[in-house]
Swiss-Prot record:
Protein name per its UniProtKB record: Large ribosomal subunit protein uL14
Protein's UniProt keywords contain rRNA-binding: yes
One of the GO biological process terms: translation
Organism: Pyrococcus abyssi (strain GE5 / Orsay)
Disulfide feature: none
Alphabetically ordered keywords of this record: Ribonucleoprotein, Ribosomal protein, RNA-binding, rRNA-binding
C-alpha cells in the first residue's frame, strides 16, 4: 500500500499548516535584506474557490510589497517565504505550534534568501521545504 501524501516519500513532514495569513496582512521581515514590514498582495501556487481571499501559512511563498524599510527597498514588489505565524497549527505527532508574531524572509523567485541572517526562530516546516532558508537559520523550532 502506498504512503499517504506527496511529502511522505520525499523525507519531509507532510503536514499542511493552517493558512492563517490572508491577502492584505502585514508581516514582520526577519532578515537583514533592508525591508522591515511587508504587506501580502498574493500567494504563489494558491488555487482557491471563486471570490475567496487567498491565504498562506508557514512555508508558503507570497508576493508582497515593502511598506517600511530602507528607501531603496520601499514600494518594491518582492517574494517572501513565511517562517512564523501566530495562529497555532498541529504537527503529526500531536504537538501544537504557534509563534509570537507573523514573520517572513525576503527571497528571490527561485527561493534563495536575499539576506544573510535570520532573526528569531524558524518553523521546521519552512526550513525543510526551503533548504537555503534552513541553512542560514539560527534557531529551528
Amino acid at each position: 500500500m502506498a504512503k499517504k501524501g506527496a511529502g511522505a516519500t520525499r523525507g519531509i513532514t507532510p503536514v499542511r499548516p493552517t493558512r492563517a495569513i490572508p491577502v492584505g496582512a502585514y508581516l514582520t521581515v526577519a532578515d537583514n535584506s533592508g525591508a522591515k514590514v511587508i504587506q501580502v498582495i498574493g500567494v504563489v501556487e494558491y488555487h482557491g474557490t471563486r471570490r475567496r481571499l487567498a491565504s498562506a501559512g508557514v512555508g508558503d511563498m507570497v508576493v508582497a510589497t515593502v511598506k517600511k524599510g530602507r528607501p531603496d527597498m520601499r514600494h518594491q514588489v518582492v517574494r517572501a517565504v513565511i517562517i512564523r505565524q501566530r495562529k497555532e497549527y498541529r504537527r503529526l505527532d500531536g504537538m501544537r505550534i504557534k509563534f509570537e508574531d507573523n514573520a517572513a524572509v525576503i527571497v528571490t523567485p527561485e527561493g534563495v534568501p536575499r539576506g544573510t541572517e535570520i532573526r528569531g526562530p524558524v518553523a521546521r516546516e519552512a526550513a525543510e521545504r526551503w533548504v537555503r532558508i534552513g541553512s542560514i537559520a539560527s534557531i529551528i523550532v
